[in-house]
Regions:
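Beta1/beta-strand and adjacent pyrophosphate-binding region of the FAD-binding site
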Residues: 2-15
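Conserved beta-strand-loop-beta-strand element in the redox core of flavoprotein oxidoreductases
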Residues: 127-143
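A glycine-rich dinucleotide-binding beta-alpha-beta segment and adjacent secondary-structure elements
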Residues: 306-372, 400-413, 539-593, 598
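Extended, charge-enriched "interface" segments that sit outside catalytic cores
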Residues: 430, 436, 447-617, 621-625
Length: 625
């Protein structure tokens, strides 16, 4: 038995799995400690991956050489591309996943990753000497040593669940909470706070009247998260269903509010703004006559279904009575109630951009303990933390992504620069350069970085190069190919499009909003021939990327120029150069915020809430710029 490792990862949730896999694949001997090896990468809440902005993060994880996209594709039971009615910067992939298959796929990957080992136990304390982490002690009394440690404890640190007046210690239903680490880190100067999240009731589909629900099928043109074309789901595809609350449901819930832990003072922590409980919806939107709910399958062959939109900590009798007033649930049976959970998290402004803590060297935090919510946000942090835990051991440079390079970069920069006062969820609106951070080109942006690290394989890198070579050739063909009116006008007349007065380049036709490359291929044999010559497994992906490149070329070029201009401030280092409390030309708020955050660069300083443009100019003047 080995007790000495390069990297130890505490917690095998979505952050921990990515961290452990990354560190081990980069060459560090890695130990993953988890309370239950049968619940690795457990989907604690909804059985889905992706969504608005979250789907882009999963694509970025995959492009870098992470695993979440592969696991999701292999366990997918429904796929949808959200926001297709909007521009491509807003397109967001989302997949329903088989919960059990998701765990099995992750465990298979971890158990077959060289350098990676697992230990089932609970970590109770860290070994820290002279401000440097040296190892981990467990509940079984085992001591492991490590050169770096990644803490990804999720909701388990002093977790407390609520169902009405009933309170149960735990990190998840039927799983114990973790004690000891929070108290140790608080004594070392870490700022510890509490947050709250929740999950809805699980229902038995055999007792649902689907004739009173609206079906929601997945996309027929099935996409995938992974850029590897060989990764596919072999599972049966299943639909979701839509139902609505009504006045009877609302009346029962309102009468039960005095028993709600959220409204009687039992829960004092702040919950996620963008995933409110059903009782919060009623209080916040008292005039709304109904709320939409989604009934989502938990897997390919299970009868268990997740009621998205009905998160609650009300007493079970109130939850059930309200549910039964929804026509589709008149005779419903449940598997378990919804519940709320409070847990500890640490102020993320006490982290560097590589997710190493400022107070303890070689100790990294990732996931919900940094104040985020969501599997995808956790996994993205876990990947970065795992990479940097390895880099700390190997003596390599820290791996940091910029705001113009990845949503993961936006996420981490927001956390360490602005901090959080409520659970942080990623949105496309948080990214000022979102047209540069599309889901379709995550491989072009990030696979070269993953390849340089040694995380993305040669196969992945070659696939990325061949794809974008094909995209560029298709764009060049569009620029060079002349379309004659004698060819296209009869086709346009049949389709009801305005005819051309004179010939033009194919590129100019693709620029038209109502015309797609695939539609034009039906009218132009030479274009059809070009498309059919493309690799079949990636044909749609290549054509889609070429079309986006053409239609949005002007916007993309303009945004790249803006990002390049702003990036100059990211290269002006200021950490350690000033004692901010002595710079009286700065505002009082600016001095306080700069002292607390201790930004790495002027660019980061400019994004701290309360730092004005004049404060930034003062810093630049003091630097002689």
């Amino acid at each position: 038995m080995n007790y000495a490792y390069d990297v130890i990862v505490i917690g095998a949730g979505h952050a921990g799995c990515e961290a452990a896999a990354a560190a081990a694949r980069l060459g560090s001997t890695t130990l993953l400690i988890t309370m239950d090896m049968n619940k690795i990468a457990q989907m604690s809440c909804n059985p889905a991956v992706g969504g608005i902005a979250k789907g882009q993060i999963v694509r970025e994880i995959d492009a870098l050489g992470g695993q979440m996209g592969i696991v999701t594709d292999r366990s997918s039971i429904q796929f949808r591309m959200l926001n297709r009615s909007k521009g491509p910067a807003m397109w967001s992939p989302r997949s329903q996943a088989d919960r059990i298959r998701f765990i099995a796929e992750w465990r298979n990957i971890l158990e077959n990753t060289p350098n990676l080992y697992m230990w089932q136990d609970s970590a109770v304390s860290l070994t820290i000497e002279n401000g440097v982490v040296k190892g981990v002690k467990t509940a079984f009394g085992v001591e492991f040593t490590a050169k770096s440690v990644v803490l990804t404890a999720g909701t388990f640190l002093n977790g407390l669940m609520h169902v009405g007046p009933v309170q149960i210690e735990g990190g998840r239903v039927s799983e114990p909470a973790s004690h000891g680490i929070t108290e140790q880190l608080r004594d070392l100067g870490f700022t510890v706070q509490r947050m709250k999240t929740g999950t809805p009731v699980r229902l038995d589909e055999r007792t649902v009247d689907f004739s009173k629900a609206t079906i929601q099928e997945g996309d027929a043109d099935f996409h995938h998260f992974s850029f590897l074309p060989t990764v596919k789901s072999e599972l049966k595809q299943r639909p979701c269903w839509i139902v609505y609350t009504n006045s009877e449901v609302h009346q029962i819930l309102r009468e039960g509010l005095p028993e709600s832990p959220l409204y009687n003072g039992q829960i004092k922590s702040i919950g996620p703004r963008y995933c409110p409980s059903i009782e919060t919806k009623l209080v916040t939107f008292p005039d709304k006559e109904q709320h939409q709910l989604f009934l989502e399958p938990e897997g390919e062959n299970t009868h268990e279904m997740y009621l998205n939109g009905f998160s609650s900590s009300m007493p079970w009798k109130v939850q059930f009575e309200a549910l039964s007033k929804i026509p589709a649930f008149a005779n419903v049976q449940a598997y378990r109630p919804g519940y709320a959970i409070e847990y500890d998290f640490f102020d993320p402004t006490q982290l560097h951009h590589n997710l190493e803590t400022k107070l303890v060297k070689n100790l990294f935090f990732a996931g919900q303990i940094n104040g985020t919510t969501g599997y995808e946000e956790a996994a993205g942090q876990g990947l970065v933390a795992g990479i940097n835990a390895h880099q700390a051991v190997a003596g390599g440079e820290s791996f940091v992504l910029g705001r113009d390079e990845a949503y993961i970069g936006v996420l981490i920069d927001d956390l360490v620069t602005k901090g959080v006062d409520e659970p942080y969820r990623m949105f496309t609106s948080r990214a000022e350069h979102r047209i540069l951070l599309r889901q379709d080109d995550a491989d072009r942006r990030l696979t070269p970085k993953g390849y340089a690290l040694g995380l993305a394989t040669q196969e992945r890198y070659d696939l990325m190069r061949s794809k974008w070579d094909a995209v560029e050739k298709l764009v060049e063909f569009a620029k060079e190919f002349s379309v004659k009116t004698s060819l296209i006008n009869p086709e346009f007349e049949r389709a009801g499009f305005p005819t051309l007065a004179h010939g033009c380049k194919l590129y100019d036709l693709i620029l038209r909003p109502q015309l797609s490359i695939f539609l034009l291929a039906e009218m132009i044999p030479e274009l059809q021939k070009r498309i059919l010559e493309l690799e079949q497994a990636r044909r749609e992906e290549i054509v889609e990327a070429a079309e986006i490149s053409i239609k949005y070329n002007g916007y993309i070029a303009r945004e790249e120029a803006i990002a390049k201009k702003l990036s100059r401030l990211e290269h002006v280092k200021i950490r350690g150069k000033f004692k901010y409390s002595d710079i009286h030309s700065l505002s009082t708020e600016a001095r306080q915020k700069l002292e607390k955050i201790d930004p790495e660069t002027v660019g980061q300083a400019s994004r701290i809430p309360g730092i004005s443009p004049s404060d930034v100019n003062i810093l630049l003047l003091l630097l002689g710029r």
